[in-house]
Amino acid sequence: MSLENFGNFLTLDEKHSFIKKYFKEFYTKDFKLFASKDKHYRTRAELSFYHENDTLFYAMFDPKSKKKYIIEYLDFADEKICAFMPRLLEYLRQDNKLKEKLFGVEFLTTKQELSITLLYHKNIEDIKSNLENLSNILHINLIARSKGKKLIFKTENLRQTLNIQDRKIFYEFNNDCFIQPNTAINEKMITWVCEILNTQKRMDLLELYCGYGNFTLALAPFFFKILATEISKSNINFALKNCELNNTTNIHFARLSSEELSLAIKKEREFFRLKDIRLDDFNFSHVLVDPPRAGLDKSVIDLIKKYGNIIYISCNPMTLKENLKELSLTHRVEEFALFDQFVNTPHLECGVFLSKV
């Protein structure tokens, strides 16, 4: 979430200075700062296409003024994206069927791979052979989308390997998953959590908003058992596959919202999706939450504040502060970390570790 409502904070030092004052009622010790490289850090990029005089350009549009900016190079994008952008554009410019009613492109990379998604205002079935040729000639994993339709050439799944405390963690996911778009910072976030856990007495972990298992797989060795919840069926399927990739057997995934889990733990409602999981078998010493921008609602806060230790990863300092007002009634902030996910922008990712008073 952007800090631009509070000022033009772009550098990590400026963000740090603001956050120290903004959260001073909860935390007065030293913050841990995690910087990112300032170029080629972002693994996801979305661009529009601009058509003029029968040719094609990458473009971005200012959301307020609607002013158009022709894009030739993205210095923040992963090197694989930067290298592929001109090759793709040259190919599209030479194929009238492919460039007709093409309005957008999404690039996604991992350390190993790259995929692109082309977005159309027409029936992509009519250009299926052209799209297949593009995928084959440029040797690219390609997805094409138009209203109600999706075509996949080669594969839409990407493989990723993260290095966490001298361990390699293997993942597979696709473009529909929520992905931390700065791989180096993602590794630093997970490592920060692991370093905290190294000093803790641990039993079982409850994780909410687990996605495809980004944190879950890396934290599995620290706990006897993990219960991880997520509402996306696709994410759950990838999480299960990622357990197989890492030979991990102590994670139990449940396709439940956080609100539904709260009802289940309080025994106010039974869920068929929990039929193979005995909640009473878990002894949660820690909770990990990585919520969307809206933060945690009251039912989730009431649930997690029962447990001794809370790890809160936040993409929105404003909702984090609101949630801490409630959580600080029962817990104390022990560690606070700042992750410069998007360099030279007002965005900031925070990590907070709380323990019960």
UniProtKB/Swiss-Prot annotation:
PROSITE patterns: SAM_MT_RNA_M5U, TRMA_1. It catalyses: uridine(54) in tRNA + S-adenosyl-L-methionine = 5-methyluridine(54) in tRNA + S-adenosyl-L-homocysteine + H(+); uridine(341) in tmRNA + S-adenosyl-L-methionine = 5-methyluridine(341) in tmRNA + S-adenosyl-L-homocysteine + H(+). Keywords: Methyltransferase, S-adenosyl-L-methionine, Transferase, tRNA processing. InterPro entries: MeTrfase_TrmA_AS, SAM-dependent_MTases_sf, TrmA_MeTrfase, U5_MeTrfase_fam. Its EC number is 2.1.1.-, 2.1.1.35. Gene3D superfamilies: 2.40.50.1070, Vaccinia Virus protein VP39. GO terms for biological process: methylation; tRNA processing. Disulfide bonds: none annotated. GO terms for cellular component: cytosol. S-adenosyl-L-methionine binds at Q180, Y209, N214, E230, D290. GO terms for molecular function: rRNA binding; tRNA (uracil(54)-C5)-methyltransferase activity, S-adenosyl methionine-dependent; tRNA binding. The active site is at C315, E349. Dual-specificity methyltransferase that catalyzes the formation of 5-methyluridine at position 54 (m5U54) in all tRNAs, and that of position 341 (m5U341) in tmRNA (transfer-mRNA). NCBIfam families: trmA_only (TIGR02143). Belongs to the class I-like SAM-binding methyltransferase superfamily. RNA M5U methyltransferase family. TrmA subfamily. This is tRNA/tmRNA (uracil-C(5))-methyltransferase. It comes from Campylobacter jejuni subsp. jejuni serotype O:2 (strain ATCC 700819 / NCTC 11168). The gene is trmA.
